[in-house]
């Protein structure tokens, strides 16, 4: 497809890299020549220097023949206006990044009235992901499918866990409840496991299971868990505001430390149930005074990756807390594997996942096997996709054991009218099902792509 991206920032560049990898024709628009030069040195794209809200600039970028226009500049207003002009100029699909909390309340009205195909709020989406991690403190990552009926949860197998040295095939019979191990990361290697694979101490495993069974499973297999009652957040930006709102509704005690006095005053008015502390979150004495040692969860959400890493390492040292760190520039896998700071979230990757899901659904619009959900796991080396199943000869009605599936691919879960099935070889896919596929084959666009 022909895709135009307005904005060469972190999100735009990350998205452009993936779209080019999936063989789309990408053109960038930005007013900053140095950013355009940088992106041209990284990926094979066309670039236009100019204002994306000006019709002549859009025309030069090829808007009349574009399939999709994505606006991810730093300005919500520019994103919305450029999408409106792009829609009028070519009737293409339009995607806008909209971050202002004032717009967030009316986003469905804005989307409908402006004819937007999709809106994405990275700060809100990241706050929701962090809230999931706080809900399941034993997890390193939580992704949801089937309208939140099914979850893929990543755990670290600790020393002393009964899972260590157990075959994957034996796990289901050894413990009560329903869960399936679908991905293993071991010493930088990704394994889509067969039943013969033996689990090891230190493995990162991604497990499909219902949320209600997580605590019971963790206790049975020796993974430490706890009930989080209070949360300390470093940084008082928009993401912290969204997160505090979510946590307040869940009756968590929240404390935000913010350096800017005016921002503190604003947050105090917006978040009456949250304690707002004016001060420098990198000041260890202040953290001690605010009793960081007693906090159940510490979330580093300042605007600087380096500060967030420092804060998380300090929290790990002085508090027995669930540790969550926001990273946007530094390579995520280096942080999570080398520094072991806890759970790492990246707004640019969350945004990219969301938009890629829409792009692949567009490509597959002529087929009914559409992508409902897409997550990229393990430093983007694994994809977990949820497909809606339509009647497909050679695929539907055939026992799974008789399908010629690609290697390094696993059908993890079937949702049949709200009934969640952990599939065996004797199960079949039926029209109307949704199915979760986990694979190292990146870029699947339709369900039939799972076949050799």
Residue locations for each model-derived region?
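Cytosolic regulatory regions of ion transport systems
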Residues: 1-452
């Amino acid at each position: 497809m022909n895709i135009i991206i307005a904005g060469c920032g972190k999100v735009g560049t990350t998205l452009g890299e993936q779209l080019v990898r999936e063989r789309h024709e990408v053109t960038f628009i930005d007013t900053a020549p140095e950013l355009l030069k940088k992106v041209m040195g990284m990926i094979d794209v066309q670039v236009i220097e100019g204002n994306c809200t000006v019709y002549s600039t859009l025309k030069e970028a090829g808007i009349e023949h574009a399939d999709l226009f994505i606006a991810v500049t730093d300005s919500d207003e520019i994103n919305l206006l450029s999408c409106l002009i792009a829609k009028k100029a070519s009737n293409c699909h339009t995607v806008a990044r909209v971050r202002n909390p004032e717009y967030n309340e009316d986003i469905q009205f804005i989307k409908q009235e402006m004819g937007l195909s999709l809106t994405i709020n990275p700060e809100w989406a990241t706050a929701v992901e962090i809230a999931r991690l706080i809900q399941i403190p034993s997890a390193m990552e939580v992704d949801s499918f089937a309208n939140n009926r099914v979850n893929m949860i990543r755990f670290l197998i600790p020393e002393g866990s009964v899972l260590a040295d157990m075959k994957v095939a034996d796990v289901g019979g050894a413990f009560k409840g329903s869960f399936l191990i679908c991905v293993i990361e071991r010493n930088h290697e990704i394994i889509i496991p067969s039943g013969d694979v033996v689990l090891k101490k230190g493995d990162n495993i991604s497990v499909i299971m219902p949320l209600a069974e997580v605590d019971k499973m963790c206790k049975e297999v020796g993974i430490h868990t706890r009930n989080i009652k209070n949360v300390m957040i470093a940084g008082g930006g928009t993401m912290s505001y969204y997160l505090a709102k979510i946590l307040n509704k869940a009756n968590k005690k929240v404390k935000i430390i913010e350096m800017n006095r005016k921002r503190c005053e604003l947050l105090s008015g917006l978040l009456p149930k949250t304690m707002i502390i004016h001060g420098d979150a990198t000041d260890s004495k202040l953290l001690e005074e605010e009793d960081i040692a007693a906090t159940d969860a510490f979330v580093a959400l300042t605007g600087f990756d380096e500060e967030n890493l420092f804060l998380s390492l300090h929290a790990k040292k002085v508090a027995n807390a669930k540790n969550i760190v926001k990273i946007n520039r530094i390579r995520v896998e280096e942080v999570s594997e080398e520094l072991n700071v806890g759970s790492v979230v990246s707004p640019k990757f969350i945004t990219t996942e969301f938009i890629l899901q829409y792009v692949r659904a567009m490509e597959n619009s002529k087929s009914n096997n559409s992508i409902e959900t897409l997550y990229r796991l393990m430093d983007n080396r694994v994809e977990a996709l949820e497909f809606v199943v339509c009647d497909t000869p050679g695929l539907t009605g055939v026992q799974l054991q008789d399908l010629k599936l690609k290697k390094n691919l696993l059908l993890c879960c079937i949702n049949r009218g709200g009934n969640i099935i952990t599939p065996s070889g004797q199960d079949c896919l039926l029209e109307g099902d949704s199915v979760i596929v986990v694979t190292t084959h990146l870029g699947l666009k339709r369900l039939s792509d799972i076949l050799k």
